[in-house]
Amino acid sequence: MLVTITCFGLNQACIKNHVVILNLLAPGRILEYHCYSNVDDLGVKRLDFNATPFTIKFHDEIPNLTKWNCILRQGPNNSMEYSYDVEVYKAGPRLIPRCGQLRAWAARIDGIYFARKYNTPLKRVLFWNK
């Protein structure tokens, strides 16, 4: 009798999760963002209107809580007077990681929009703080 065993590490067969940040504010309006997790800080960056979206790709931290936040800022004449600290991804403590999750966040003049799936409309979920 022949027994074959295949062993994968926790993340080898798991497609990375994606957090996508889009700037849909207005021509000339810059979105400033600072994204960080419990294990990584990506620093402060800027995204031009309709530029290629910024994407964070990651695996869930097992068995710890995986959480990503992004502080989004914008304003007329790049004043950055409007902001929101958004919890853009959260997976509770677990033994089996979430795989291939999408969290899309879009900054628009009237608020912050969200979608969990590709090819679904973004819906406003937050209003800017001043």
UniProtKB/Swiss-Prot annotation:
Cell compartments where the protein resides: Secreted
Example GO BP: rejection of self pollen
Domain of life: Eukaryota
Glycosites: N64, N77
GO CC list: extracellular region
Keywords from the UniProt entry: Glycoprotein, Secreted, Self-incompatibility, Signal
Family (UniProt): Belongs to the plant self-incompatibility (S1) protein family.
Protein name: S-protein homolog 30
Gene: SPH30
